[in-house]
């Protein structure tokens, strides 16, 4: 009965004209940035953070969430039609999706992707609703040492599951923790890393950093790598998949949904890891006798990954909503949005702001319905948007970013910080470093330090307090095992292969 009462609270919050509008705006923007190669949900959410300051917290979170899971839908469109993933998680969809388009079956591929995404999204939302309250009750048992260990696990997970070099991911985490130390120490009042700059006394602004690393850097990166795009196929064909397509895809959709739902909860997991894991699983299950072979237009190569990335995108909200721990860069930005509204992330959100908590969960069901409507009947509109020249798109984004950053504190210094981090983000990207650990570390670093200090204060400086507690010790043990496994040569080579196209 408690779950039904909570869902009723959620429906009362989500099914209002204002929140329905923001849900629709969010999923529409998400589909748009998913369709347009070079954009993505992280950059878009970062750019829209300043706008959310003027919105009701529920409306803001509903819109930002819609952008994230909406982008997973839209990313498949460009992957199938032009062989360019609009969103990173859609990389593997290119392998079979575009082959199907070349065979004149683009409509079937798009239809299966949309239906698989809808089923996975609805299932994942049910999981969030079912497990949110039990996990939140467990989180209330957490003290400073448990939170410290949980944040260590979050940072280790971000390192282990980040694409590319393990050492580079660790380096990005250390840099982000140092950046989180900038400003006045709240305990001692000492100034750290301000270098005589008064504007840095309050620390680096999260919006400026995230918008620089993802907004400005993304523009520089795409202009630097500007190239020609393949022509969009002239005819998409019938969008609704046939009964045969649905029958062939049913198993892949089911497996992708379950796999994505589980992997989405992991720190650093989410949609990207889920889609790669699903494609690998389907390929292994089919074996060498698959007809057609994977990579040559097998519908399961579209159904599995698209279901997995949507399920993973939505279950990644579980640790953010229940524990206040972001599992990926978008969730870190969502926590930033909560902080903008003076809402402390963590298990107390469900008790102090139940309409926000349950309204967000219910809005995901509504958003999935909106996305089916947007992605099947309006496919022709998204195809036309693929022809928008980048030289017109990026100046508008640049102006929007600048206005957004300035509007938070009305401080020109924030614009310089954004430009600086834009250049920094572009440089580290050129060096093969992923920026997601930087955002996660910047959010978790200060929380890690604060909980470590509290735990040591309560234990009178006894460092063994972190390993003597059953929950804290277990979390640290899991972190150590994950790190050791990632260092092993066989695991490391498998990890690197997971993020490379076959």
Give the location of each predicted region.
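A structural-propensity feature for long, helix-poor, extended segments
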Residues: 68-80, 86, 297-323, 327, ...
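Membrane-embedded alpha-helical modules
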Residues: 111-227, 340-494
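Helix-loop-helix hairpins and the membrane-proximal interhelical loops
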Residues: 1-58, 139, 191-298, 383, ...
């Amino acid at each position: 009965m408690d779950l039904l009462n909570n869902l009723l609270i959620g429906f009362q919050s989500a099914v209002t004209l204002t929140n329905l509008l923001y849900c629709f705006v969010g999923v529409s923007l998400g589909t748009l940035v998913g369709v347009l190669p070079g954009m993505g949900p992280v950059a878009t959410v970062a750019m829209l953070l300043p706008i959310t300051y003027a919105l009701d917290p529920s409306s803001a979170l509903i819109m930002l969430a819609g952008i994230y899971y909406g982008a997973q839908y839209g990313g498949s469109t460009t992957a199938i039609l032009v062989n360019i993933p609009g969103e990173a998680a859609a990389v593997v969809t290119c392998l079979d999706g575009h082959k199907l388009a070349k065979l004149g079956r683009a409509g079937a591929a798009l239809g299966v992707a949309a239906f698989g995404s809808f089923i996975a999204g609805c299932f994942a939302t049910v999981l969030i609703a079912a497990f949110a309250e039990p996990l939140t009750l467990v989180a209330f048992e957490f003290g400073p040492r448990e939170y410290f260990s949980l944040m260590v696990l979050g940072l280790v997970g971000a390192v282990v599951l980040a694409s590319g070099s393990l050492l580079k991911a660790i380096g990005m985490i250390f840099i982000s923790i140092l950046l989180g130390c900038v400003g006045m120490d709240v305990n001692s009042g000492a100034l750290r890393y301000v270098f005589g700059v008064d504007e840095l006394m309050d620390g680096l602004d999260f919006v400026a950093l995230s918008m620089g690393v993802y907004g400005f850097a993304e523009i520089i990166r795409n202009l630097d790598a500007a190239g020609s795009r393949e022509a969009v196929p002239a005819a998409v064909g019938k969008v609704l998949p046939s009964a045969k397509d649905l029958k062939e895809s049913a198993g892949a959709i089911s497996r992708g949904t379950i796999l994505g739902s589980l992997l989405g909860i992991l720190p650093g997991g989410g949609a990207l890891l889920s889609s790669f894991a699903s494609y690998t699983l389907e390929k292994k299950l089919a074996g060498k006798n698959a007809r057609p072979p994977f990579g040559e237009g097998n519908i399961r190569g579209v159904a599995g990954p698209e279901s997995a990335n949507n399920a993973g995108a939505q279950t990644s909200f579980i640790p953010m909503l229940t524990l206040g721990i972001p599992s990926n860069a978008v969730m870190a930005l969502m926590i930033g949005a909560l902080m903008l509204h003076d809402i402390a992330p963590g298990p107390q959100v469900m008790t102090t702001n139940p309409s926000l908590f349950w309204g967000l969960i219910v809005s995901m069901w509504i958003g999935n319905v909106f996305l089916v409507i947007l992605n099947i009947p309006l496919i022709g509109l998204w195809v036309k948007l693929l022809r928008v020249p980048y030289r017109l798109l990026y100046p508008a984004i640049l102006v929007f970013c600048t206005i957004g950053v300035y509007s938070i504190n009305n401080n020109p210094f924030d614009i310089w910080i954004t430009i600086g981090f834009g250049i920094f983000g572009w440089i580290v990207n050129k060096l093969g470093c992923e920026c997601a650990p930087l955002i996660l570390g910047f959010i978790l670093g200060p929380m890690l330090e604060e909980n470590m200090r509290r735990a040591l204060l309560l234990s009178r400086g006894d460092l063994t307090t972190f390993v003597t507690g059953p929950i804290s010790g277990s979390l640290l043990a899991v972190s150590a095992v994950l790190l050791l496994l990632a260092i092993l040569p066989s695991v490391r080579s498998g990890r690197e292969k997971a993020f490379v196209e076959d």
